[in-house]
From Swiss-Prot:
PANTHER family membership: VOLTAGE-DEPENDENT CALCIUM CHANNEL TYPE A SUBUNIT ALPHA-1, VOLTAGE-DEPENDENT L-TYPE CALCIUM CHANNEL SUBUNIT ALPHA-1S
Gene3D superfamilies recorded: 1.10.287.70, 6.10.250.2180, 6.10.250.2500, Voltage-gated potassium channels. Chain C
Gene that produces this protein: CACNA1S
Ranges annotated as spanning the membrane: 52-70, 86-106, 116-136, 161-179, 197-218, 310-330, 433-451, 463-483, 495-514, 524-542, 562-581, 634-653, 800-818, 831-850, 867-885, 893-911, 931-950, 1039-1060, 1119-1140, 1149-1170, 1181-1200, 1232-1250, 1269-1289, 1357-1381
Residues carrying covalently attached carbohydrate according to the record: 79, 257
Organism name: Oryctolagus cuniculus (Rabbit)
Protein known as: Voltage-dependent L-type calcium channel subunit alpha-1S
I repeat residues: 38-337
Motif, Selectivity filter of repeat II: chain positions: 612-615
Length: 1873
């Protein structure tokens, strides 16, 4: 998160400027002269920091916006009086803003101080706007003066000002600096800018590649169209726009009589849409990526060159560009937004909501308690009254008192009755019956409103009126009852009650107003619809729904600030649009452009339209045409639209989704919190109800209960069972088999992990268990043991049988797709009919077999008890019935034939991965239920309002001058294309709009299309023009109607639909996680562990041959990379420079360049082949790609040469001799077009170069891997719908100018799929729906009866298209989004946390140490390797050596017998320690748990790999951890000696003391440190390091960190932490130890090269190693300084024969195969201090190490060499390995046990190594050490008086004994420095 911190600081500085001025330390001087005492500055400060000042400025900005909006732009720079007045007003605003800026500058200083005016971004914006305003004003004055002197120049000079004046529109942005919540939204958008920039690069890259491909393939193809012969009139059918044609080939032929295909046409969209040059090609590709108008471009290309293959280009473009890359934007924004919101949440918004709920619950409790109390009072009073009557005495019989008593009693009675009655009311209001009554009334109310429609009968209107009044009175009664029963205070506490009250009051008001006639019923009827909101009352008892509604209301706040931002954004662009296009949208062709910028409201609507993306391209084309068409200045207009579209549609609208996803997660957590409470209650009940069970059993029950909610929302078939996992060593079984718990016993189903994205099959490995034969008999005749039944069972469960059936399912599906929908009786269909019979019989046999095996349906486990089997049965039954009924005319049979389409669904039951995706989709649908409900309610409400507003108003006459149906008769004249010479006579028709609001259902349909953003501008303008009922439209009659649509779009389309999408995404992600709920690893840990297990080392090929090496060196150098990068860029530029109609020279040059580039890239390939050899070269996928491209390019060059050679005879086409009818333009070398693509593909190589984009790409490919089953599901969906479409709509005639035409139809399977793909992208799907509904013309070749020409199509189309659109747009495409958001969360993740993307670095650096990719390196290289990898994975080069070693102790990878560590083990250990996976607690237990988890998640992990990564318990393991632990201990010994030598100046010789000090070191310093290290707690260590370094710096003692392997200076930055050569010179080899270079001034003498040849050096060595210091009780102090002290590494052990090589190898061999299992025995035996020394037991599990190892037996040596040399050789070196003598071992083990390292104490090998290290450090022979140790033990025994301590060693007593022994030598212990 570091990168974001400066912005945060900026924000912190910015925000206080307005609200908290006191915080700002004001600079002492402003503008170099004004001090704080200066009166002018004082005044400015007080004004600027005066609260109302801010408000005044905001109001001024607002007024300025209003002024800008009222301005009316006019064509040709005309003006009216209003505009002139506004321009004068402009000066006033300018003055105000200038004064404000000046005062702020005087108050805060201008630039140089910390918080000066220009240091805030918002102020910079203000300043620029003010400055430009002043500058413009000055220029205008200059213009005026000039125009007075030279009148002609005014026009020219005025233009400059107009451009500058456009900047005024930025003023509304100043509102942002005044509203803090806006800044939060903006900041989260700004934070996302970096990852968004990467995505933008990727999009740009795609656009460039596709643009160049388009340029190569479609250049100049769009300029031919059909003209009438001999004229320039384009020949088109009615309603059809002109489109390209082709003279030959499979393009569009000209069919109209007297027309021909010829060139010279500017092209579609006035020549804007084409691929003739790079710029327009990019524009066209970008327009396709936005999924708006892409099918038009595809159809034009089809018309021009035929429809065989252009679809590949466009479909891939949409899939990659729109579905994938643009969804990344969403991933990034939602990630950023969640982070921003989490910060806000930590301030407790969510908490407040929780508390509020709690409070309300408490309050309800109190209220009911108080009312209960009142009732009790009433009861008491009744009893009291009786006693009062009984005991009333006759003495008080005075009349006055009696009268008074009566009043008092009356009041009392009244109060009592009131209380009783009120309590009764309270009970009534709270009862369920009352609730359902109210719901019933609400439903009736809804019904009465929904029954309204156009042309309804009078009685219905009366009925609705009466119902309205009755229901209103009922609602009023309900409200009053509630108020009385609950009391006003409690009533108004509920938000729903307040809302209810508002609705009722508005209803009463409406009734009064209508009755009195003060208001038209229309405006008020909208109020009546508000009553529908009462429907939301249902949510009261529906927890999850009410939580959803609460979270929606909650997100209104965050949405409000976003809406404000959106509104500002729209205003700014609308104002800018008015400046640019105001008054310019009037063209020659008399067609009115509705989306224009001629006034402010209209500009707002146009900008909003572009924002929703509907038809934005046509608005842009108009803008380009307004500036003179597709030539230089006009094209620049597209920049405005592209920026508007990108910022608005991609960024702002995706923030909506981000907010939605965010809030849903919140609603989920609310619901789950409540569920948790319920569970808690249940658990309490359970434990109360289990008196006779033991505690343990209760806990089992509790656990079971805990596991239950996890499965919620998952269908039972998909419940998870934990796989019992067997390993050779241990069996880890589920401790509570499910049968223990009643009611949890499930059917024997194969387990299916539930997840939306099926894992790669490797992880899923579903072992299907054969379901046993059920107990009962099948068909009452076959018993379970019957041979026939057993045989059937065997067949049914055989894999070959399943595969056989799957094959048949596939074949039968293919047969369905191959049918001919038009000609039912064709030969093809007859053949397919026979096949159908075969398939059906096979399926019937399968079902009979299965029923025989499992029984039909009577008993448990029978065939029909499974939903998927019922589906199978249905499909087969349908096939059988339709075979029986032959005639296809019967409508029943038609439906049955269509139902055969469900056959592919049978595959679901057989492909497990697919089955589980389907289940996931069902779960998602179930979970989405709530959202659907809320959305439907809102939709219904808007539909009712729509009916009130627009019923019967969408009629029109095609002759616009006629207003009613009566007038709309006869004929009228039309001028074609506005040309008065061309007249045409047409009949008048009274038309009803396709989408209208005449009744609630039509209204809901119309609104649904609006919510999909398709065709809503047409509907909107239709509504704006609407007049009275049954009247024609009036232009711009009611512009305010736009508000209805805009509110609907924002509420439903932006917000609810996004929440819907968000819900799908959240559900899928949760489903993905449920699979791993009880695996204890989170997603990131899983991904990293999976990477560590699956990764393989890279080969790093370095040639041996010197010449080859030279080539290799060149090819791998970065300069070569940059050179190739530059060449590819050049190649791109050359390709982009081509254009249509280019000159001959240009053609020639581009051909030569192409050859040159091909030669260069071929050379690159040859060089690389030489450098890497074939195996190395083809090992890298990028190289394979290069290779293919080079081969393709060479073929391309050869073909081009042949082509030019044959050009004289007409190119390659003429080889066949058919050249007569080919014009040169047509033969545009199409044969070589395919190979031309290879030129373009070179660009893709750029991807391998850019780091950020490469990571994106990597994740991209990874997310493709996650999609196989999702893709399969989509394929199935498309298949089924395509086949249904062919059966239903295949016979509709293809009519040009309608939506079912030559390019878009259901007549063949591929066409049907393409049409569906078009619908899925939302391209005018509602028009296709209308074109497929009933009453369409039939295809002339189909089999319709005479007189039935117009009977094709069916109204089933409504269900078909709506269901398809819903499934596609909301579910399926969101699966894509969910997968992408899952995989791309790294884009916004905190980079300091280790993630899978960090792990590639490890592979790269490992390859340098292991170039052959053997997967092993010397353990001594590990430390250097890890210090070269940056954190969070490695240690980084600044990590002190000691910390690095300690981390290695914590990582504890297994060490192989040859002294190497493996690749996977090292990577796994790194991941494990970095992410703290099972690092706490007992290490062995943790290892076993982790093994079990890995086996459970990745079932196919080989045991070998698992043992490598986590050795099993029984293993005699040697680990790197122990290796480094001995060195840490040794290092601590040395520090003590060093300290003692410094203190005394000489080295004491008393051996026992030395040994004792060494033991104290182990116990007090080394052991705790190692213990902490192993438990992974390194934070304290690092803090210590830091503290010590600082302390040392203060004292100016430049000491060195105690480095183990050479010295590392922690305070001087190493200039070169590791010279490249050192990769192979192992700095850790102890036989010839290499020191890293030193830079510290402390050491005066150099390090000795070899102690044998240099006597002085030898003396020094002895001196340096001879320093022994004793343990001091001042433990903490020592811990403090243990790291920073001046110490020398002992340079090499090879010098002293006795303690040298042999000893080392001896000690480390002892680390060998003797390990943990004997821990218990050791602990038991070793710690018996009373035992005589000579009886000290040998380390129990250890083979006596004195025996020399047999020849060939492998033992580990720490120098990394195999020790299988002959024993003689060893003795000749004088290094016979010895066991540590018992006394030493005993003492060391005691020390280790006391230090808390029991496991290491139990490891005999480790003890041996430690004792050797002790001897080395003290520079004593092991025998001497043993003698000293024996003395120590004797001394201790004498002190203890030979008293033996029973049992295990008590830490206190042993310490006591040591202390007493030590007391005698107290004088020798030096204090610590």
């Amino acid at each position: 998160m570091e990168p974001s911190s400066p912005q945060d600081e900026g924000l912190r500085k910015k925000q206080p400027k307005k609200p908290l001025p006191e915080v700002l330390p004001r600079p002492p001087r402003a503008l170099f002269c004004l001090t704080l005492q200066n009166p002018l500055r004082k005044a400015c400060i007080s004004i600027v920091e005066w609260k109302p000042f801010e408000t005044i400025i905001l109001l001024t900005i607002f007024a300025n916006c209003v002024a800008l909006a009222v301005y009316l732009p006019m064509p040709e720079d005309d003006n009216n009086s209003l505009n002139l007045g506004l321009e004068k007003l402009e000066y006033f605003f300018l003055t105000v803003f200038s004064i404000e800026a000046a005062m702020k500058i005087i108050a805060y200083g201008f630039l140089f101080h910390q918080d000066a005016y220009l240091r805030s971004g918002w102020n910079v914006l203000d300043f620029i706007i003010v400055f430009l305003g002043v500058f413009t004003a000055i220029l205008e004055q200059v213009n005026v003066i000039q125009s007075n002197t030279a009148p002609m120049s005014s026009k020219g000079a005025g233009l400059d000002v107009k451009a500058l004046r456009a900047f005024r529109v930025l003023r509304p942005l100043r509102l942002v600096s005044g509203v803090p919540s806006l800044q939060v939204v903006l900041n989260s958008i700004f934070k996302a800018m970096l990852p968004l920039f990467h995505i933008a690069l990727l999009v740009l890259f795609m656009v460039i590649i596709y643009a160049i491909i388009g340029l190569e393939l479609f250049k100049g193809k769009m300029h031919k169209t059909c003209y009438y012969i001999g004229t320039d009139i384009v020949a088109t059918v009615e309603n059809e726009k002109p489109s390209p044609c082709a003279r030959t080939g499979s393009g569009r032929p000209c069919t109209i009589n007297g027309s021909e295909c010829r060139g010279g046409w500017p092209g579609p969209n006035h020549g804007i849409t084409h691929f003739d040059n790079f710029g327009f090609s990019m524009l066209t590709v970008y327009q396709c990526i936005t999924m708006e108008g892409w099918t038009d471009v595809l159809y034009w290309v089809n018309d021009a060159i035929g429809n065989e293959w252009p679809w590949i280009y466009f479909v891939t473009l949409i899939l990659l560009g729109s579905f994938f890359i643009l969804n990344l934007v969403l991933g990034v924004l939602s990630g950023e937004f969640t982070k921003e919101r989490e910060k806000a949440k930590s301030r407790g918004t969510f908490q407040k909501l929780r508390e509020k709920q709690q409070l309300e619950e408490d309050l309800r409790g109190y209220m009911s308690w108080i009312t209960q109390g009142e009732v009790m009072d009433v009861e008491d009073l009744r009893e009291g009254k009786l006693s009062l009557e009984e005991g009333g005495s006759d003495t008080e019989s005075l009349y006055e008192i009696e009268g008074l008593n009566k009043i008092i009693q009356f009041i009392r009675h009244w109060r009592q009755w009131n209380r009783v009655f009120r309590w009764k009311c309270h009970d009534l209001v709270k009862s369920r019956v009352f609730y359902w009554l109210v719901i019933l009334i609400v439903a009736l109310n809804t019904l009465s409103i929904a029954s309204e429609h156009h042309n309804q009968p009078l009685w219905l209107t009366h009925l609705q009126d009466i119902a309205n009044r009755v229901l209103l009175s009922l609602f009023t009664i309900e409200m009053l009852l509630k108020m009385y029963g609950l009391g006003l205070r409690q009533y108004f506490m509920s938000i729903f009650n307040r809302f209810d009250c508002f609705v009722v009051c508005s209803g009463i008001l409406e009734l009064l107003l209508v009755e009195s006639g003060a208001m038209t019923p229309l405006g008020i009827s909208v109020l009546r619809c508000i009553r529908l909101l009462r429907l939301f009352k249902i949510t009261k008892y529906w927890t999850s729904l009410s939580n959803l509604v609460a979270s929606l209301l909650n997100s209104i706040r965050s949405i409000a600030s976003l809406l404000l931002l959106l509104f500002l954004f729209i205003i700014i662009f609308a104002l800018l649009g008015m400046q640019l296009f105001g008054g310019r949208y009037d063209f020659e062709d008399t067609e009115v452009r509705r989306s224009n910028f001629d006034n402010f409201p209209q500009a707002l609507i146009s900008v909003f339209q572009v924002l929703t993306g509907e038809d934005w391209n046509s608005v842009m084309y108009n803008g380009i045409m307004a500036y003179g068409g597709p030539s230089y200045p006009g094209v620049l207009v597209c920049i405005y639209f592209i920026i508007l579209f990108v910022c608005g549609n991609y960024i702002l609208l995706n923030v909506f989704l981000a907010i939605a996803v965010d809030n849903l997660a919140e609603a989920e957590s609310l619901t789950s919190a409540q569920k948790a409470k319920a569970e808690e209650r249940k658990r309490r009940k359970m434990s109360r109800g289990l008196p006779d069970k033991t505690e343990e059993e209760k806990s089992v029950m509790a656990k079971k209960l805990e596991q239950k909610p996890k499965g919620e929302g998952i269908p039972t078939t998909a419940k998870l069972k934990v796989d019992e996992f067997e390993s050779n060593v241990n069996e880890v079984k589920d401790p509570y088999p499910s049968a223990d718990f009643p009611g949890d016993d499930e059917e024997d189903e194969p387990e299916i992990p539930v997840s939306p994205r099926p894992r790669p099959l490797a992880e899923l490995q579903l072992k299907e268990k054969a379901v046993p034969i059920p107990e009962a008999s099948s068909f009452f005749i076959f018993s379970p043991t019957n041979k026939v039944r057993v045989l059937c069972h065997r067949i049914v469960n055989a894999t070959w049988f399943t595969n056989f059936i799957l094959l048949f399912i596939l074949l039968s599906s293919a047969a369905l797709a191959a049918e001919d929908p038009i000609r039912a009786e064709s030969v093809r269909n007859q053949i397919l009919g026979y096949f159908d019979i075969a398939f059906t019989s096979v399926f019937t046999v399968e079902i009979v077999l299965k029923m025989t095996t499992y029984g039909a349906f009577l008993h448990k486990g029978s065939f029909c008890r499974n939903y998927f089997n019922i589906l199978d049965l249905l499909v087969v039954a349908v096939s059988l019935i339709s075979m029986g009924l032959e005639s296809s005319t019967i409508s029943v049979v038609k439906i049955l034939r269509v139902l055969r389409v469900l056959r592919p669904l049978r595959a679901i039951n057989r492909a497990k991965g697919l089955k589980h995706v389907v289940q996931c989709v069902f779960v998602a649908i179930r979970t989405i239920g709530n959202i659907v409900l809320v959305t439907t309610l809102l939709q219904f409400m808007f539909a009712c309002i729509g009916v009130q507003l627009f019923k019967g108003k969408f009629f029109s006459c095609n002759d616009l001058s006629k207003m009613t149906e009566e007038e709309c008769r006869g004929y009228y004249y039309v001028y074609k294309d506005g040309d008065p010479t061309q007249m045409e006579l047409r009949p008048r028709q009274w038309i009803h709009n396709d989408f209208h609001f005449d009744n609630v259902l039509s209204a809901m349909m119309s609104l649904f299309t609006v919510s999909t953003f398709e065709g809503w501008p047409q509907l909107l303008y239709r509504a704006i023009d609407s007049n009275e009922e049954d009247m024609g439209p009036v232009y711009n009659n009611r512009v305010e109607m736009a508000i209805f649509f805009i509110i609907y779009i924002i509420l439903i389309a932006f917000f609810m639909m996004n929440i819907f999408v968000g819900f799908v995404i959240v559900t899928f992600q949760e489903q993905g996680e449920t699979e791993y709920k009880n695996c204890e690893l989170d997603k990131n840990q899983r991904q990293c562990v999976q990477y560590a297990l699956k990764a393989r080392p890279l080969r790093c090929y370095i040639p041996k041959n010197p010449y080859q090496y030279q080539v290799w060196y060149v090819v791998t150098s970065s300069y070569f990379e940059y050179l190739m990068f530059a060449l590819i860029m050049l190649n791109t530029i050359c390709l982009g420079m081509q254009h249509y109609h280019q000159s001959e020279e240009m053609n020639h040059i581009s051909d030569i360049l192409n050859v040159a580039f091909t030669i260069i890239f071929t050379l690159e390939m040859i060089l690389k082949l030489l450098a890497f050899k074939a195996r190395g070269y083809f090992g890298d996928p990028w190289n394979v790609f290069d290779f293919l491209i080079v081969i393709g390019s060479i073929i391309d060059v050869i073909l081009s040469e042949i082509d030019t050679f044959l050009a004289s005879s007409g190119g390659l086409y003429c080889l066949g001799g058919g050249c007569g009818n080919v014009d040169p333009d047509e033969s545009a070398r199409i044969s070589s077009a395919f190979f031309r693509l290879f030129r373009v593909m070179r660009l893709i190589k750029l991807l391998s170069r850019a780091e950020g984009v490469r990571t994106l790409l990597w994740t991209f490919i990874k997310s493709f891997q996650a999609l196989p089953y999702v893709a399969l599901l989509i394929v199935m969906l498309f298949f089924i719908y395509a086949v249904i479409g062919m059966q239903m709509f295949g016979k509709i005639a293809l009519v040009d100018g309608t939506q079912i035409n030559r390019n878009n139809n259901f007549q063949t399977f591929p066409q049907a799929v393409l049409l569906l793909f078009r619908c899925a992208t939302g391209e005018a799907w509602q028009e296709i729906l209308l074109a497929c509904s009933y009453g369409k013309l039939c295809d002339p070749e189909s089999d319709y009866a005479p007189g039935e020409e117009y009977t094709c199509g069916t109204n089933f189309a409504y269900y078909y298209f709506i269901s398809f659109y819903m499934l596609c747009a909301f579910l399926i495409i969101n699966l894509f989004v969910a997968v992408i958001m899952d995989n791309f969360d790294y884009l916004t993740r905190d980079w300091s946390i280790l993630g899978p993307h960090h792990l590639d670095e490890f592979k790269a650096i490992w390859a340098e140490y292991d170039p052959e990719a053997k997967g092993r390196i010397k353990h001594l290289d590990v430390v250097t390797l890890l210090r070269r990898i940056q954190p969070p994975l490695g240690f980084g080069k600044f990590c002190p050596h000691r910390v690095a070693c300690k981390r290695l102790v914590g990582m504890n990878m297994p060490l192989n017998s040859d002294g190497t560590v493996t690749f996977n083990a090292t990577l796994f250990a790194l991941v494990r320690t970095a992410l703290k996976i099972k690092t706490e607690g007992n290490f062995e237990q943790a290892n076993e748990e982790l093994r079990a988890i890995i086996k459970k998640i990745w079932k196919r992990t080989s045991m070998k790999l698992l043992d490598q990564v986590i050795p099993p318990i029984g293993d005699d393991e040697v680990t790197v951890g122990k290796f480094y632990a001995t060195f840490l201990i040794q290092e601590h010994f040395r520090k003590f000696m060093k300290r003692q030598e410094e203190y005394y100046g000489y080295r004491p010789k008393k051996d026992t003391v030395q040994i004792q000090a060494g033991l104290r070191t182990i116990e007090e310093e080394a052991a705790p440190e190692i213990r902490r290290t192993i438990s992974g707690d390194l934070t304290a260590e690092e803090e210590l390091e830091r503290a010590m370094v600082e302390a040392a710096m203060e004292e100016r003692i430049f000491r060195r960190t105690g480095g183990l392997f050479g010295q590392v200076d922690t305070f001087l930055e190493r200039t070169n932490s590791l010279p490249p050569v050192m990769a192979n010179q192992r700095p850790l080899q102890f036989a010839e130890i290499e020191m890293e270079e030193l830079e510290s001034p402390v050491f005066l003498e150099d390090f000795p090269q070899d102690a044998r040849t240099n006597p002085l050096a030898r003396a020094n060595t002895n001196n340096a190693n001879a320093n022994v210091a004793y343990g001091n009780s001042n433990h903490s102090n020592n811990q403090m300084f243990s790291s920073v002290h001046c110490e020398r590494e002992f340079p090499g052990e090879a010098e002293t024969p006795a303690a040298g090589r042999g000893a080392l190898s001896h000690s480390h061999r002892a680390l060998g195969p003797h390990s943990k299992p004997c821990a218990g025995k050791l602990n038991g035996q070793l710690v018996q201090p009373g035992m005589p020394i000579n009886q000290a037991p040998p380390a129990p599990c250890q083979q006596p190490s004195t025996d020399p190892p047999e020849r060939g037996q492998r033992r580990t040596s720490l120098t990394g060499s195999l020790q299988d040399e002959a024993p003689q050789r060893r003795s000749s070196e004088g290094s016979t390995p010895r066991r540590p003598a018992p006394a030493t071992a005993l003492l060391i083990q005691e020390a280790l046990v006391r230090g808390g390292l029991d496991t290491l104490a139990a490891d005999a090998g480790f003890v041996t190594a430690t004792s050797q290290a002790l001897a080395d450090a003290c520079q004593m022979e092991p025998e001497e050490v043993e003698v000293a140790a024996t003395e120590l033990l004797k001394a201790r025994e004498s002190v203890q008086g030979m008293a033996s301590v029973p049992g295990s060693l008590s830490r206190r007593s042993s310490l006591g004994s040591l202390d007493q022994v030590q007391g005698s030598q107290e004088t020798l212990i030096p204090p610590r420095p």
